């Protein structure tokens, strides 16, 4: 599982009318391993790592919908899971982002993953950390070589990400001025 390409859209685009990041993701052999096949152990480990995912409604538009989608029938593919993880990582860092969309993109196993971001560097880092988290939760035999460095720790990586995001966040006064300008359509 690897990112083939990344695009950052700062304004209206084919994907949304607000800033989004697009990842072209190659699942490789993991195309044969949707979440239903990975099983409850994988899903439960993800739920423990990011409990806020329980609030994601996904296509059901109700809390718990995303985990329901992961467990139903075959489940869903890891590109779709990465979309939700990148959004949730930004949420735990204090950003109120919700939009995401994942679609198959040509060759089998290649997906276009699009998700909203509030701050460019934070959004990019959320996608990269999300990919590492998903890889770390895979059974050893399915884990892509080199995807998870020796000694990598999810709690430590999560905390570093939150600190990274907080250092880049606008202060309260500046943030309120920016929001007011956006609400009035002032660039």
Where does each model-flagged region fall?
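Preference for protein termini
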Residues: 1-187
């Amino acid at each position: 599982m690897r990112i083939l390409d990344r695009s950052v859209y700062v304004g209206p685009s084919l994907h949304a009318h607000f800033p989004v990041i697009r990842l072209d993701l190659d699942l490789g052999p993991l195309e044969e391993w949707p979440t239903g096949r990975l099983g409850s152990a994988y899903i439960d480990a993800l739920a423990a790592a990011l409990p806020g995912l329980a609030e994601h409604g996904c296509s059901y538009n109700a809390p718990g919908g995303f985990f329901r989608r992961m467990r139903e029938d075959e489940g869903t593919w890891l590109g779709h899971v990465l979309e939700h993880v990148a959004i949730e990582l930004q949420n735990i860092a204090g950003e109120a982002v919700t939009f995401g969309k994942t679609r198959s993109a040509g060759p089998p196993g290649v997906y276009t993953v699009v998700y909203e971001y509030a701050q460019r560097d934070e959004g990019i880092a959320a996608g990269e950390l999300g990919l590492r988290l998903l890889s770390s939760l895979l059974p050893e035999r399915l884990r892509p070589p080199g995807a998870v460095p020796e000694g990598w720790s999810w709690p430590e990586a999560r905390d570093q990400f939150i600190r990274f995001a907080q250092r880049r966040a606008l202060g309260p006064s500046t943030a309120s001025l920016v929001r007011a300008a956006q609400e009035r359509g002032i660039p």
